[in-house]
């Protein structure tokens, strides 16, 4: 009787420890994912020889990256959606 109670208690403790460890990993995963997503700035054209989203430009000079166009009104590169 004492052995079965000890085994049941040890099983519950083990279950608690495993559950806590997996929960802490689950909590860290979204944080790691978000940090990796926001560490990469895909909107900037640095190192590509073209200007990315939000960079200042001169209309008519074709300085913006592909799929971007220089706004005549605001004078910065924006995503070109076409018409």
UniProtKB/Swiss-Prot annotation:
Residue positions where Leucine amide is found in the record: 81
Keyword Protein transport (UniProt): no
SS bonds (residue pairs): 50-65, 57-70, 64-77
Entry keyword Disulfide bond: yes
Pfam families: Toxin_12
Record GO cellular component, one term: extracellular region
Entry-linked SUPFAM superfamilies: omega toxin-like
Keywords associated with the record: Amidation, Disulfide bond, Ion channel impairing toxin, Knottin, Neurotoxin, Presynaptic neurotoxin, Secreted, Signal, Toxin, Voltage-gated sodium channel impairing toxin
Example of a GO MF term: ion channel inhibitor activity
Tissue: Expressed by the venom gland.
UniProt propeptide residues: 22-48
Domain of life: Eukaryota
InterPro entries in the cross-refs: Huwentoxin-1, Huwentoxin_CS1
First and last residue of the signal peptide: 1-21
Chief localization: secreted
Subcellular location: Secreted
Function: Lethal neurotoxin. Selectively blocks tetrodotoxin-sensitive voltage-gated sodium channels (Nav). Does not affect tetrodotoxin-resistant voltage-gated sodium channels or calcium channels.
The record's note on its domains: The presence of a 'disulfide through disulfide knot' structurally defines this protein as a knottin.
Family to which the UniProt record says this protein belongs: Belongs to the neurotoxin 10 (Hwtx-1) family. 15 (Hntx-3) subfamily.
Subunit structure: Monomer.
Name of this protein: Mu-theraphotoxin-Hhn2j 4
Species name: Cyriopagopus hainanus (Chinese bird spider)
Upper lineage: Eukaryota, Metazoa, Ecdysozoa, Arthropoda, Chelicerata
